[in-house]
Each structure stands twice: as C-alpha cells, then as structure tokens.
Amino acid sequence: MADTSLTILVIDENPTRATILEEGLRDAGLVDVVRLDTTHELLRRIFEIDPDVILIDLASPSRDALEQMFQVSRTVKRPVAMFVDQSDSSMIEAAVDAGVSAYIVDGLKKERVKSILDMTVSRFNAFDRLTRELQQARDELADRKLIERAKGILMKSRGISEEEAY
C-alpha cells in the first residue's frame, strides 16, 4: 500500500487523461499530486519537484517520445509507471531496460491507478534491493580477489604458507 504522503508527479500532455490519473490518486487519498503538461526541460523540472513516484501517460507515443521517457527513467532513479495505449515487444523490452517499474498498456482507468501505483513502488523497491545486493556481492568478490592476489605475492616473496600469508 502506497504511503499517502508521497509526492506523485503526473506527466501528461493530454488534460483529460491527466485528470483520470489525478482523480484516481486523489480518490486513493493521495493529495500531493503535481501535473506537468509538457516535456520541455523535463529533467530539470523533475529534479525541482523531487517526486517520490512518477506516472507518465503517453497515450500513443512516438518512438522518440518513448525514448525520452526511458531516458528520464534511467536518470531519476525513482519508481516510474508508464501508461501507453499500444505497444510492441521492443518497446516493452526498452521500458524494462530503462528501469520503468510498471509499463501499462491500454490500462488507464481511474479505479486501477492506486493498485498500479502500489505495484510500481513495490517493484521499484524490490529491484533497487536486488541492485544493491548485486553491487555488494561484486564488491565482496573484488575484495576477495585482492586478498588472494596479496596472499600470492606474500607467499612467493617470503616463502610462507597460505595460512601465514592470510
């Protein structure tokens, strides 16, 4: 369940569709909703607003518009749900690669917004946790490699056992 104190950014150039998202959020008790109706200077504006979650509605986006939104998702490191009316497998794959937490095709309904928001935040948190765990494992592996290399140097230069070198 999403925290009702979250700041939600709705990016939608279509006022009717943006209203559907906003009403769904407000009906769910989320009151800190900010709407952007243009993508001009989008990253700067996102960093100024500093939202907890971003909902992007693109209806029937061009490939360029989708790529711009994927770039936003890669850059901001926040839960992002993207609503589109139609898609193909390459766009879905690009969305996943960009870190979009939820990619909703033909699913813009006021009644579904809250559950989609909850799923978006949960999926982002799970992915973020896995990313941190992966980085920790990589760091530990690098440390072990360094220790093994140092042990090898000590064993060779001083003629000592592995246990003594450790």
Predicted features and spans:
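C-terminal output helix
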Residues: 90, 108-117
